[in-house]
Amino acid sequence: MDCIFCKIVNGEIPSKKLYEDDNVRVIMDVYPKVDGHSLIIPKKHITDFTEISDEELANVNKVAKLVGLSIMKKLGANALTKAVNYGDSQAVKHFHMHLLPDYTIKEKSDRSIDEIYEIIK
C-alpha cells in the first residue's frame, strides 16, 4: 500500500513522534497551522471515520485528551481543537485526528517544528 501515514507509523518515513501505543502514533504535523499542531494516526489503515470502530475511536479520543492536555500545558495554549476531515477535505486517505492548540495570539510563531517538538516531546 502506498499510504504515507502507513509508512510513517511503520517507521519507513521519519517523524517527530510525541506518543505511541499499540494502536496509534502521534506526530507533529509537518505543515502546522499553529505551534503544536499534531496528528493522531491509527497504525491500522482505516480510510476515514466511517470505517473506524467505536473501540478504535475511543482510543483515539483517549490519546487526544492525554496528548492534547500535555501540549496545552507545555506550550501555554488556552484551548484545543480536535478535527477530523472527511471527503474532499481529507488530504490523506488514512483516518487521522488533528490536535490544534489554541492561543490568545492566533498567529503561528516563527519557531521551527524542531523547537516546538523539543518543548512538547
Predicted regions: what they are:
Residues 1-121:
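HIT superfamily nucleotide-processing domains
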